[in-house]
Amino acid sequence: MSRIRDVVRKKGGSSHCRTTDEPTGKSLETLVRHYIKICRSRLNSELEYFEKNPSFSEALEKASMAINEKGKRFDHQRRLTSVSLEGSKVRLSKVINSLKTCKNFAELHDLLEKLLHDVHGIGELYCYDTALRLGAFLGIYPELVYLHRGTRDGARALGLNWKEDTLDPKIFPPPIQELSPHEIEDFLCIYKKHLK
């Protein structure tokens, strides 16, 4: 069984999901069930794609350029310029050994933010998504919920401290705690308007 499926079995999976299949009802339980039924598999597929790359170099090339399994740019990075993505790729390629020896997701994420903070157009969502994709290859996943623009809106709607960089998954309402930290990030981003 693949590593991502092991993570899904233990903690749940995740997915970047745009769906026209709207949830019926707005209770947290209903929204979480909708996420699990409709959206979870999409990020699982994305992460499995990165997990199965033949080498870290290839995973880094695809992750830094935000290229999906169809050879297209991921939706979250669709507005980034090729110059920004290329600048990120060049910078990350120079420290490939440091990246692939990160022991946990936080270390990988922090290294990406440190390396890319001054690359024009590259922000916290790109750093998170790239760390998640590279982390899938390395078998390391977030233990905390990382906040960026979309997820901050969801955290704020739940009355949580949306000004933090990360939140402990244990502070979320019980239905949301059924999800893994990277699923919670995805859930907040997808359902932020339903949480208001």
Where are these regions (language model features)?
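Extended, charge-biased low-complexity segments
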Residues: P54-Q77
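C-terminal accessory module of base-excision DNA glycosylases/AP lyases that mediates lesion recognition
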Residues: M1-N53, L108-H109, L125-K196
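Generic detector of intrinsically disordered, low-complexity, polar/charged segments
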Residues: R9-K10, E22, N68, S84, ...
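Generic structural signal for hydrophobic core residues of well-folded globular domains
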Residues: A66-G71, L115, V119, L134-G135, ...
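Helix-hairpin-helix/helix-loop-helix acidic hairpins
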Residues: F74-H120
